């Protein structure tokens, strides 16, 4: 990646958009300190970051309830879990088996899992992947609601401009590992 420069402030949604293979996920992983930059500097004013990856590998044959899934790799309590599920509109799924969830329900659970500890930066990598048209609209509305309610910055990674434009404050375009300047949307 070359030429990347953008900020994600509290209460702001910034979208990194570009075709497959243009380095969007790599950029996100550098911001999250999952990957190191070969050169240059990645800075963050917070360690309270959460990430919803583009793909998550789950053994769908394993009996796993939503409440148990929420606790994997994170020390959150039941109150945090129910509040996060309520924020994402799926509190009724608390004791449901994960393998029985629809694509949209599972995405909402993933987002709830990420926001349970109230991050200051939320990174969402292709959050509407595998969700139907109506579900996409609902998820983009949910993302805006989360930004407003938690006053957290959101970095939204996408390759689809359709609904992104209605919820984002800034758009940064990534193309063949070069990033164009951020576009401010008013």
What spans do the regions from the language model cover?
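The feature captures the beta-strand-to-loop junction immediately N-terminal to the Walker
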Residues: 17-19
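Conserved catalytic motifs of ABC-family nucleotide-binding domains
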Residues: 118
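Conserved small/polar residues in nucleotide/adenosyl-binding loops
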Residues: 176-182
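H-loop/switch region of ABC-family ATPase nucleotide-binding domains
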Residues: 158-159
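Catalytic Walker B motif of ABC-type/P-loop ATPase nucleotide-binding domains
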Residues: 122-126
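Conserved ABC ATPase "signature" region
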Residues: 78-95
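Conserved ABC ATPase signature
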Residues: 97-101, 105
């Amino acid at each position: 990646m070359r030429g990347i420069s953008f900020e994600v402030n509290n209460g702001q949604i910034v979208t990194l958009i570009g075709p497959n293979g243009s380095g969007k996920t790599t950029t996100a992983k550098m911001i999250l300190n999952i990957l190191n930059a070969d050169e240059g500097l990645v800075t963050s004013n917070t360690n309270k970051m959460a990430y919803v990856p583009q793909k998550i590998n789950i053994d769908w044959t394993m009996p796993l309830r939503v409440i148990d899934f929420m606790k994997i790799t994170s020390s959150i309590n039941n109150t945090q879990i129910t509040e996060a599920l309520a924020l994402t509109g799926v509190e009724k799924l608390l004791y449901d088996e994960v393998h029985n969830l629809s694509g949209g329900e599972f995405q909402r659970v993933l987002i709830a899992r990420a926001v349970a500890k109230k991050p200051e930066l939320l990174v969402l990598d292709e959050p509407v992947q595998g969700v139907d048209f109506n579900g996409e609209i609902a998820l983009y509305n949910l993302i805006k609601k989360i930004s407003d309610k938690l006053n957290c910055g959101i970095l939204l990674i996408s390759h689809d401009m359709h609904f992104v434009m209605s919820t984002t404050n800034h758009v940064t375009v990534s193309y063949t590992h070069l990033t164009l300047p951020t576009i401010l949307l008013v």
